[in-house]
Design a protein with these regions (language model features):
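N-terminal localization/anchoring segments of enzymes in phospholipid and broader phosphate metabolism
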Residues: 1-183
Length: 183
């Protein structure tokens, strides 16, 4: 296969480096930051669409309890999910939020909502994947923030990499237990 790639790229195989470990491409983000004023070098930004299944001007929990909603990221906006987490953090009927986190942004609205939930007395359990390439430092810092707020933080399982983004919100309304799930 290496020969085929070399032929296609018109390279000699002596210019190929073999490595057992993945290449560290974190420098790419630094290049991106330095070239921000050269927008012609970047792909056109795609704007996420608002889901027609949700009215973001109304509380989301009742809408979701009424019918299932499918959101497809990044094509649809993540905003409804962030609003849902904020609603859950403030809803007196919500007693727990459990979530897996893979990549955390420098200004994570997800973590802000989880911290608010913990501060409001909700049981918050989070599995954080520390081996999220290029985001390890953010994940470590946010994990400390979550722990400081009283969240129970678990750091993955040896030999397995958690890449899924799951959320389970548990709510008790009267005698009924309700679950809202994000997969």
């Amino acid at each position: 296969m290496v020969g085929e790639v070399c032929d296609y790229c018109e390279l000699d195989e002596k210019h190929v480096f073999y490595s057992k470990s993945p290449l560290d491409l974190s420098f790419v983000f630094q290049i991106q930051d330095k070239l921000r004023d050269r927008q012609e070098l970047f792909f056109e930004k795609r704007v996420s669409q608002q889901s027609p299944d949700l009215d973001v001007m109304k509380p989301l929990i009742p809408q979701i309890l009424e019918k299932d909603v499918l959101l497809s990221y990044p094509y649809e906006s993540i905003r409804p999910f962030l609003n849902l987490l904020q609603e859950a953090a403030r809803d007196p009927k919500v007693n727990a939020i459990r979530m897996t986190l893979y990549r955390l942004a420098k200004n994570s609205k997800v973590v802000e909502a989880l911290v608010e939930a913990a501060e409001n007395g909700k049981q918050v359990e989070v599995l954080v994947e520390l081996k999220a390439r290029f985001d390890e430092e953010n994940n470590i810092e946010w994990s400390r923030t979550l722990e400081d707020a009283g969240c129970h933080v678990v750091y993955g399982v040896d030999g397995l990499k958690v890449h899924s983004k799951l959320c389970l919100i548990t709510r008790k309304d009267g005698g009924r237990i309700q679950y809202i799930t994000q997969i």
